[in-house]
Amino acid sequence: MLQPRSDRHRAAAGVVTALLLLLVGLSPLSQSSHAQGMTTLTFLGPDFDEWVAFVKVANQIGKPMGIQVKPDYLPWDDVFQKALIDSKSGVRTWDYVYVYNTWVPGLSAAKAILPINDFMTSPAATSAVQPNDFITLTTAGLELNGKLWAMPMLAAPYMMAYRTDLFANPIEKKAFQAKYGYPLALPQTYKQLMDVAQFFTRKAGEKLMGKTLDQDFYGVVLANKSGGFLFHRYEHILVAYGANLIYDPKTMQPTVNSPQGIAAAKYYVALHKYMEPGSESLTGGGAERIMASGRGAIAMDALDNMLSVLPVAKLSKVVGKINYALLPTQLASRPHANVGDANGLAIYALTQHRDAAFKLATAVLNTQGTKQVMKEYPALVPMRASVIHDPEVRTNYAPVFNAMSTFLNGKPYTVFIPPLKEWVQAQDIYEQAMSAAMSGQQSVEDALNGAQAKVVALFKRQGYIK
């Protein structure tokens, strides 16, 4: 059969190229076989260790499929805006986009990402996703309007990590009992957390467990950097105090300065006195390094942040001295209140490789693929029941299994970010107010009243309220 003209020109060019390569002693096969027939998928995401691990495993699994992943890493808080701007501008560069659960409303409303359900058009495709295997307490944040918007990758339940040696020390137990009138124990309420944080906050030169400290010691360690880190720690206390997350979904009325919101903010500002100085500049990883250095009694953070540092011998001085527990309780009706936190892999709406993107995503984030990612990033908190209960995971990743068992068996009161496409904007307003209150620039009331007015204005512009 006669080749089309363009193909013949390419064939002729190929012969000439081969002859030239032979003349200079090069093999055309050695120069092109790696790229030949490979589909390259581009990934827009943060350079977090778990996503570096994902890319590595994706390229291992994808190689025999003829698929490779090329990452483009940005700072975490820039990924959301980049995905929004590029999708609105018609940029077709991306195939995958990292998604944090609070971004789902905005990205889905902007049609920047595709629901995974769009690909589940056959029994085989549905089987590849394994939706019934997901732990809904962890994955619900990636769902909206009955659709799953990203392949679940990493659960990030917020928990406490605490120094078991401190709480068991007889000197500290005796001193705590004398000062507060009840036994020293892991805090079950936020009042107890405040007491414990105050008690363990010490200056260099004071004693801890009978030994003189050469550095300051902090009762509680938290990351309070703006850009989401502060709000994602504070929101659990906000919910614990009975408040809505920024607004009432039933009425769409902002509730930033509600009595419950004011009480929660006052508590957090008071707790801030017992945190490490400079917490306003710290992300989760930075805060955990303070805890790992042996200078904190309790950390409150996403479980994977803590697991990626505290049990790691080359990073931590407290290996073998840490245990994990649910967050405290403020209201009996909201035990161990927790805001669902999830990270996933979304398929970019303008991808030019829909089928390949779906095929590789499901291969990497199925049961076996997730276990491979855990080998590269042992702190990964999986979102599949089949992985959590896998005998190999129980044995080789005992800290992950034990902590997640505590979380799931404890059945914390869990809420998820409401479906508001302007969520990130509203969150930033609230976070700025909290920063002002924590720094002493404004009173809690003034800061939250100002934030309330700004969120009301935002909601009016969007037509949610009059």
Name these PLM-found stretches.
Residues 2-5, 14, 26-112, 121-131, ...:
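Conserved N-terminal structural module of periplasmic/extracytoplasmic solute-binding proteins
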Residues 319-329, 375-432, 436, 461-466:
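Long, aromatic- and glycine/proline-rich binding clefts that accommodate carbohydrate-like moieties
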Residues 64-65, 88, 166, 262, ...:
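Extracytoplasmic/periplasmic substrate-recognition and gating elements
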Residues 117-133, 174-186, 212-213, 220-227, ...:
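Short, solvent-exposed loop/beta-turn-alpha elements that line the ligand-binding surface or hinge
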Residues 101-159, 168, 191, 210-216, ...:
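Hinge/lid segment of periplasmic solute-binding proteins
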Residues 143-154, 158, 185-253, 296:
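Extracytoplasmic/periplasmic solute-binding protein
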Residues 192-201, 236-281, 323, 327:
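Glycine-centered hinge/linker elements that transmit conformational signals in sensory
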Residues 55-56, 77-115, 128-150, 160, ...:
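Pocket-flanking alpha-helical
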